[in-house]
Regions:
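Methionine residue identity
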Residues: 1-3
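N-terminal Rossmann-like FAD-binding beta1-loop-alpha1 element of flavoenzymes
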Residues: 31-54
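Short, Lys/Arg-enriched N-terminal segments with co-localized hydrophobic residues
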Residues: 18-29
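N-terminal FAD cofactor-binding segment of flavoenzymes
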Residues: 47-52, 56-91
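Short beta-strand to alpha-helix junction loop
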Residues: 94-113
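A conserved FAD-binding loop/helix module that cradles the flavin
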Residues: 240-267
């Protein structure tokens, strides 16, 4: 059963903590737990599903919602590697100077469906309560949702793509940093995004956005770094806010795929 064993040592340094993490995991028949229902989590899960059993834990009812990422792809042909033509049609792609605009909520819905069809276990409305190092694995204890799912999982590898919420009273996963590998990205800053009708864009009074992404459904996303700098006279159809990389080049489907690939290679 065990064909080969790799010992991975990861060293993290922060202003408050310096520790080393030694994890031994199987190349095949691995049990992998991924914390956080992000696009990164889904891409990681589909990779590790080929090597064993993968479970994703997400506190919210649906992965990737509410949306907090621009609907943007630079090379739309990359979607062919993941989605059917019918699924791609739902994305409502349209070319812009800043890249191709797309409906990010459907990127997440489709990717969730694809991951589940490949055998990834996805547990929404599920919070990690504790972790414990056993002799040959890490035991993860979770809450139970209405599906009467298991609440105990044994893992060889735990990856966290979860970002701590800044909302007061928001439930959080309880993680042991010594037992998890964080999917670390670049330093994040606040971003604000708003959606308005393309026929109303651009407004003369609107400050220049960092990203402007029109879609073929007649709607346009505008994104700024920081807080909302402007509200259209009729208001936004939808607003998004969250923390993202300060680099616009990092904010695309293509860039996320590349970062996940780099992360996987760093563990091999």
């Amino acid at each position: 059963m065990l064909m080969k064993q790799i010992v991975l040592i990861v060293v993290f340094v922060s202003p408050h903590v310096l520790f080393s993490l030694s994890i031994s995991f199987q190349v095949i028949n691995m049990n992998v737990c991924i914390i956080g229902g992000t696009l990164e989590a889904l891409l990681l899960a589909m990779h590790y599903q080929e090597k064993g059993t993968v479970s994703i834990f997400e506190i919210d009812a649906e992965l990737g919602l509410p949306i907090s990422h621009p609907g943007r792809v630079l090379n739309p042909s990359i979607f062919n590697e993941y989605f059917s033509p019918q699924q791609i049609e739902f994305l409502k792609l349209s070319s812009n100077p800043d890249g191709w605009g797309c409906r990010w909520e459907w990127v997440m819905k489709h990717m969730t469906s694809v991951a589940a069809s490949k055998g990834v276990n996805i547990y929404p409305r599920t919070r990690v309560l504790s972790m414990e190092q056993l002799h040959d694995c890490i035991r993860v204890i979770t809450t139970n949702n209405e599906r009467h799912q298991p609440t105990q999982f044994d893992a060889d590898l735990i990856i966290s793509t979860h970002e701590e919420s800044t909302k007061p009273g928001r439930l959080q996963h309880v993680l042991d940093e010594s037992l998890t590998i964080p999917f670390k990205e670049q330093e994040h800053i606040p971003w604000f995004g708003g959606t308005l009708l393309t026929l109303h864009h651009p407004y003369p009074s609107m400050p220049k956005p960092a990203l402007t992404l029109s879609r073929s459904d007649g709607q346009t996303e505008v994104w700024w770094k920081g807080e909302c700098p402007w509200i259209p006279p009729a208001g936004y159809l939808e607003t998004c806010s969250g923390t993202l990389s300060s680099l616009v080049d990092d904010l695309s489907f293509d860039a996320i795929v590349q970062r996940v690939s780099d992360f996987i290679h760093s563990l091999e």
